[in-house]
Amino acid sequence: MSVLLRGVRLYGEGEQVDVLVEGEQIANIGAGIDIPDTADVIDAIDQVLLPGLVDLHTHLREPGREYAEDIETGSAAAALGGYTAVFAMPNTTPVADSPVVTDHVWRRGQQVGLVDVHPVGAVTVGLAGAELTEMGMMAAGAAQVRIFSDDGNCVHNPLVMRRALEYATGLGVLIAQHAEEPRLTVGAVAHEGPTAARLGLSGWPRAAEESIVARDALLARDAGARVHICHASTAGTVEILKWAKEQGISITAEVTPHHLLLDDSRLASYDGVNRVNPPLRETADAVALRQALADGIIDCVTTDHAPHADHEKCVEFSAARPGMLGLQTALSVVVHTMVVPGLLSWRDVAQVMSENPARIAGLPDHGRPLEVGEPANLTVVDPDVTWTVTGDGLASRSANTPYEAMTLPATVTATLLRGKVTARGQKSPV
């Protein structure tokens, strides 16, 4: 089967070209390519072609909470958002702390076939922070687990974290830390600041995140290990990351679209959809995060896609489960916050949403150059078409988007996974 993408601009640059995909690879790039008789032609005149997006941080809820999301609906949302590979966090039921669970998640992703679903293995048994899991067995299993995290919980015991980093280094895998000192966040539901004080909400201090980021940078330095920081949310974290990188410490970090765009002023409505961990911070933090992404201090954008059913969100703010949808809106939010103001080019978007996450995770066939012979994991974006977000109109089984009724720029018009069209015109095969 052949697919011809007609009239695209690679990375949004240069002249319009046609891109011919044959089988699983890019077969030809040029102007006026003859259309094979059997080709599926996608007219994408003056649209942007990017390598398929890669998300290091999602919650697909399977196994255990399929009422909120499952691998099929999550994969559909990912494909419609331009993603070709996603990483599913281990806070499922049961926890993904053994090859039984991680291999199940991998196989389910393969069955659905819309994106490559890579399970993230737990660092500690049951996410309890005490006993290390058999990371080697998960890395050697069918899923070949590349990233380990207790996300949702912090590996807060420094000795356990140091042992995890040492173990991971020997296996050639990565530890991703949910940076939260739990003794500073007991009962916290909102950023600690004037807004939380005025609204009577228990505050989550910046220091809860920053203290763990600093500690883990030092642990990684001493262990000669890599460490990845999940969902950076404060200006102070940016400064610590900058210092650590200047010292030659092997540390990478991600930021979510919602922390780039939103701030804690939204909490005035007491709408549970705005509760998220780490919490929405102040405007100054969002500005610092945007600049850090532009400067390369923060390496990549991840969604932290966290579906929750209505009965888990439509409650009083402090009782709402934390998390937001993100897979279908991420690219548009990045365009809004980073491309429109001139902080990033489309080529930069490819770097922070495809190339860097693929490199961090060690995915050899994603985040590749747009060249002949490369895998046809591709995303086509119309930069000139806006769309209005509605939770009910998203592919996820849940509707907890913080962007309800917002009009966002840029629309994904097609996604290809190894040459197979997995989304087209905001429709998915699922």
UniProtKB/Swiss-Prot annotation:
Q: Which cofactor does it need?
A: Zn(2+)
Q: Which GO molecular function annotation, any one, does this entry have? A: dihydroorotase activity
Q: Which residues form the active site?
A: D304
User: Which keywords, in A-to-Z order, does the entry hold?
Assistant: Hydrolase, Metal-binding, Pyrimidine biosynthesis, Zinc
Binding of Zn(2+) 1, residues:
H57, H59, D151, D304
Family, similarity comment: Belongs to the metallo-dependent hydrolases superfamily. DHOase family. Class I DHOase subfamily.
Query: What name does this protein carry?
Result: Dihydroorotase
Q: Which organism is it from?
A: Mycobacterium leprae (strain TN)
Q: What is the lineage of its organism?
A: Bacteria, Bacillati, Actinomycetota, Actinomycetes, Mycobacteriales
